[in-house]
């Protein structure tokens, strides 16, 4: 079981990163709400991981804190919600927003997430509302992600078309349909926007 990685951050290709630990490179998928808080490429990073073994693959999902990982594990306990959908849910909104939506039984907001239909949204509310009651909201998310302005994403691709392409690819990887991803990014894109900003603003607009 791989629960924590500490090493050199080699690549950032949202929503995936590559981190080198003792000469071994680990590919890790991370919710965008956590991805925004990663240090620059070349810096040391500490990532808490959830390890998934399937017949055809071994996958790592990464988080900045143990509590973010704990919330992810609660989300994927819900009937019909696997790691891929859990990743999309916690990319489409911050952990605090998700908890608030569940507590308020806000089905209309939850169904805007990729892969979440009305039945899945209702299951999330029914199955998670009681489980989340004992959690303090401040323990469920990285404060900087939910409350503070993001950095400028200077280590991300800055060429206008490359930034657009990377943003579209990231949204598709999170479960959005190609046409929806392309249309949303195109509507938001400006010449000076980095791919990180494009991804973040696109996700906001779809929620």
Swiss-Prot record:
Has three domains with a flexible linker between the domains II and III and assumes an 'L' shape. Domain III is highly mobile and contacts RuvB. Belongs to the RuvA family. Gene3D superfamilies: 5' to 3' exonuclease, C-terminal subdomain (1.10.150.20), DNA helicase RuvA subunit, C-terminal domain (1.10.8.10), Nucleic acid-binding proteins (2.40.50.140). It is found in: Cytoplasm. Residues 1-64 are annotated as: Domain I. Homotetramer. Forms an RuvA(8)-RuvB(12)-Holliday junction (HJ) complex. HJ DNA is sandwiched between 2 RuvA tetramers; dsDNA enters through RuvA and exits via RuvB. An RuvB hexamer assembles on each DNA strand where it exits the tetramer. Each RuvB hexamer is contacted by two RuvA subunits (via domain III) on 2 adjacent RuvB subunits; this complex drives branch migration. In the full resolvosome a probable DNA-RuvA(4)-RuvB(12)-RuvC(2) complex forms which resolves the HJ. The keyword Cytoplasm applies. GO terms for biological process: DNA recombination; DNA repair. The RuvA-RuvB-RuvC complex processes Holliday junction (HJ) DNA during genetic recombination and DNA repair, while the RuvA-RuvB complex plays an important role in the rescue of blocked DNA replication forks via replication fork reversal (RFR). RuvA specifically binds to HJ cruciform DNA, conferring on it an open structure. The RuvB hexamer acts as an ATP-dependent pump, pulling dsDNA into and through the RuvAB complex. HJ branch migration allows RuvC to scan DNA until it finds its consensus sequence, where it cleaves and resolves the cruciform DNA. Pfam families: HHH_5 (PF14520), RuvA_C (PF07499), RuvA_N (PF01330). One of its GO terms (molecular function) is four-way junction DNA binding. Residues 144-158 are annotated as: Flexible linker. NCBIfam families: ruvA. The keyword Cytoplasm applies. This is Holliday junction branch migration complex subunit RuvA. Residues 65-143 are annotated as: Domain II. Residues 159-207 are annotated as: Domain III. It comes from Aliivibrio fischeri (strain ATCC 700601 / ES114). It comes from the Bacteria. Keywords: Cytoplasm, DNA damage, DNA recombination, DNA repair, DNA-binding. GO terms for cellular component: cytoplasm; Holliday junction helicase complex; Holliday junction resolvase complex.
């Amino acid at each position: 079981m791989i629960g924590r990685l500490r090493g050199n951050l080699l690549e950032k290709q949202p929503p995936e990163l590559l981190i080198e630990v003792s000469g071994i490179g680990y590919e890790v998928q991370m919710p965008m709400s956590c991805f925004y808080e990663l240090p620059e490429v070349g810096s040391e990073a500490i990532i808490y991981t959830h390890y998934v073994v399937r017949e055809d693959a071994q996958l790592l999902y990464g988080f900045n804190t143990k509590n973010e990982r704990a919330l992810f594990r609660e989300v994927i306990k819900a009937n019909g919600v696997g790691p891929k959908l859990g990743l999309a849910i916690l990319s489409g909104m911050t952990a605090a927003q998700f908890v608030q939506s569940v507590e308020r039984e806000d089905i209309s907001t939850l169904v805007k997430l990729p892969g979440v239909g009305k039945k899945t949204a209702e299951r999330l509310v029914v199955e998670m509302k009681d489980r989340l009651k004992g959690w303090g909201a401040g323990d469920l998310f990285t404060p900087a992600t939910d409350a503070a302005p993001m950095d400028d994403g200077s280590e991300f691709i800055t060429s206008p078309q490359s930034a657009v392409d990377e943003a579209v690819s990231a949204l598709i990887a999170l479960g959005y349909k190609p046409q929806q991803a392309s249309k949303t990014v195109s509507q938001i894109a400006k010449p000076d926007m980095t791919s990180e900003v494009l991804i973040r603003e696109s996700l906001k607009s779809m929620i």
